[in-house]
Amino acid sequence: MVMIKSLVFDKDGVLLDLIETWLPVMQGLAEYTLSLVPANAGRAVSRAMLLSSVGINDHTGRVDPNGLFARGSFFEIRAVWQTLLPAGMINLQEDETYRSEVKKIVRELGRGNAVAKGDLLTPLTQLSDAGFKLAVLTNDSEGSARQGLEEVGIAHLFEPIIGADSGHGGKPDPRGLLHCCALHGSAPAETLMI
């Protein structure tokens, strides 16, 4: 019988409350993106359209659990938003000014807003004390993930914390999980993804 040695956690929706933590940030990013659309662009784009395209109902705040907001990366969200913007606008994937401003908005609106999914410190400490190796694998950026986990007081329990920008691809690409296995000295069959 194979024994589990390594526990690799997703962050949003598992450790942190996705909606409480990230909905205000996503609304701010939609507002910023919308502010770049020229008034004479000839194509109507609204905050509700941008948010709806990634699975957020702007009027009710409800989130589609299968939408990009819940399951994707910001790389994927930018790609969808690009299709809604007028032709000739900046490339949301490549424009360094846009990407820099997005990082600033995420830091400002996300700082201090991480909401844990209940008491995490006690059970995670018990798992660590029992000898399990703990890691986080998320489609968020590594820096943002670390910030949120630090805010709720549990970052010190995880090694590594891997984001979509950590060089292993975003989920469901298996490279991040395999990297966790290698660092923990555990085989994939000895690893549980939560």
Q: What spans do the regions from the language model cover?
A:
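N-terminal helical cap/lid subdomain that shapes the substrate entry/recognition surface
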Residues: I4-L121, A130, R146
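A general structural motif
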Residues: V2-I4, G131, P188-E190
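Substrate-recognition "cap/lid" segment bordering the active-site pocket of phosphatases
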Residues: E108-A116, A135, D140-M193
